């Protein structure tokens, strides 16, 4: 009877804990932020890896790549303003045109090999042709691979495609955003809501074109929005 009661409690609290999971808040990276504050000689090199498609790669109007205006570099710039003693590497393992099913195949070889202190995953924009289920499975494999190595993860919801009305309820980008939110909550990891950043601009009356370099790539103003979402964790 006692064993049955203990089993019930373990199941109850285990299931309750999973169901009540929340997306990580600004305290998620407290250990990393502590490292970023350290001065020489106590500090160490921090590796941030950005894994995904053409947007983190820096493609603006294809084939032009504007690395210094893309959100990984803009994030680095903001981090250095906030943490002047930190030695930070921004490493982009992203590939233009790639989806998460392709990205997961090279995750260990191209991402984990850098011994990251933090991994960003940004694939949803290119995953639409695969569907939600396959995308979820691929992203989940990458999350688990990172967490198995005690590496924190921040997922990014999709930046816009001009062919999608971001203000329309239930559009395909919103569906992928909701899927990623659920994953982030289930694993209690971070989520930078790029989709919401752009949608808010539209619902406030701004023209989405002002933030885009081409139909599916943000310009520098658009990348600034994405970097803003990331910096909430720092």
Regions found by a protein language model. Name each.
Residues 21-93, 107-115:
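Serine-esterase "nucleophile elbow" of acetyl-processing enzymes
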Residues 33, 72, 76, 104, ...:
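Extracytoplasmic/secreted envelope proteins and their assembly/folding machinery
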Residues 54-57, 95-101, 125-130, 159-163, ...:
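Solvent-exposed loop/turn segments at secondary-structure junctions
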Residues 118:
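Short, Asp-centered acidic motifs that coordinate Mg2+ and/or phosphate
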Residues 159-234:
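Catalytic His-Asp segment of secreted/periplasmic serine-dependent ester chemistry enzymes
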